[in-house]
């Protein structure tokens, strides 16, 4: 079973006001206790770690605790270069957000359409995808079964013949394929990016008021000066009280975003897991310039 190691950084400002608190801080830093617990299907090691740890100390911690191929590291902030670099140098697997973002893409789409008071059944969805992985194929199938039309933009069209045949044979659904850099996305209102990187995406002529739901781990930005649409790089969610209470009891709820916490729970579950089991709701969407307002989404979706 995969294990999730939660790296919690100690806020030393809470300890350094008085000499006695300094002693408490250093004692806690040296004699941290690993709390090993289970939540859902995930085993958790609650490991406090300082943001000012030097590289050697981080390596020592990882060497002792992560001597297993089945361990995934999850930090409060993987933009912490020290932690991120050590993870890569030591080839230690860390939890990425791509799986959860893909699973949420349909819910994000429904959230956007609900703001506009439109139905997914009346919407054409364009999907950027390179690989026919299980989860990518699953997302394509689920969207195709609900949307008015689905167009797949890929330079590996041959990889999607099986999903094309399945959708047509079992559901009578025909999907479109395209890889024209000038035409594929030039009139596309809704684009879901499953696995294109920023460089590849910017090779295409993109409709200047498109809404792009980005599912890859890195933020993307459209380089065209004509582009005045929306790129959704992140999302704020909520989930049911039961799961919330479990994370509160572990002391994790206030230290990690709900998106990250849900991702850790779903890591061991089948990609077909219904996230509605956790009563997941979209609260806010975020782009390159911060939170995206509902009025902004409404504007971009209606004008063409």
Residue locations for each model-derived region?
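A glycine-rich, Thr/Ser-enriched phosphate-binding loop motif common to dinucleotide/cofactor-binding enzymes
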Residues: 93-111
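Structural motif
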Residues: 6-10, 48-50, 75-79, 128-131, ...
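Metallocofactor- and cofactor-centric catalytic cores in central/energy metabolism, strongly enriched
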Residues: 6-17, 27-86, 110, 291-304
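Glycine-rich phosphate/diphosphate-binding loop of Rossmann-like nucleotide-binding domains
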Residues: 115-182
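Short, charged/polar "capping" segments at the starts of alpha-helices
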Residues: 79-85, 136, 157-164, 199-201, ...
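A short, well-structured beta->alpha microelement
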Residues: 26-33, 52-54, 164, 168-185, ...
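Rossmann-like adenosine-cofactor binding region
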Residues: 174-243
């Amino acid at each position: 079973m995969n294990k999730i190691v939660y790296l919690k950084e100690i806020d030393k400002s809470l300890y350094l006001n008085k000499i006695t608190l300094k002693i408490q801080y250093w004692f806690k830093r040296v004699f941290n206790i690993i709390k090993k617990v289970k939540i859902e299907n995930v085993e958790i090691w609650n490991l406090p770690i300082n943001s000012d740890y030097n590289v050697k100390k981080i390596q020592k911690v990882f060497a002792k605790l992560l001597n297993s191929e089945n361990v995934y590291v999850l930090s409060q902030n993987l933009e912490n270069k020290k932690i991120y670099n050590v993870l890569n140098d030591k080839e230690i697997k860390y939890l990425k957000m791509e799986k959860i973002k893909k699973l949420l893409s349909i819910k994000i789409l429904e959230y956007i359409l609900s703001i506009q008071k439109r139905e997914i059944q009346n919407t054409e969805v364009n999907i950027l995808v390179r690989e026919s992985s299980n989860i990518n194929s699953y997302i394509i199938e689920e969207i195709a079964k609900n949307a008015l039309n689905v167009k797949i933009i890929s330079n590996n069209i041959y990889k999607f013949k099986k999903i094309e045949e399945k959708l047509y044979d079992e559901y009578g659904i025909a999907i479109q394929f395209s890889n024209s850099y000038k035409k594929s996305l030039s009139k596309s209102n809704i684009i879901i990016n499953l696995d294109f990187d920023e460089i590849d995406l910017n090779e295409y002529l993109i409709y200047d008021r498109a809404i792009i739901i980005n599912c890859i781990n890195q933020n993307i930005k459209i380089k065209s000066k004509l582009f005045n649409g929306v790129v959704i790089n992140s999302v704020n969610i909520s989930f049911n009280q039961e799961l919330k209470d479990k994370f509160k009891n572990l002391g994790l709820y206030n230290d990690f975003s709900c998106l990250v916490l849900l991702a850790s729970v779903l890591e061991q579950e089948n990609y077909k897991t219904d996230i509605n089991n956790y009563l997941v709701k979209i609260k806010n969407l975020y782009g390159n310039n911060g939170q995206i307002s509902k009025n902004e989404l409404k504007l971009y979706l209606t004008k063409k």
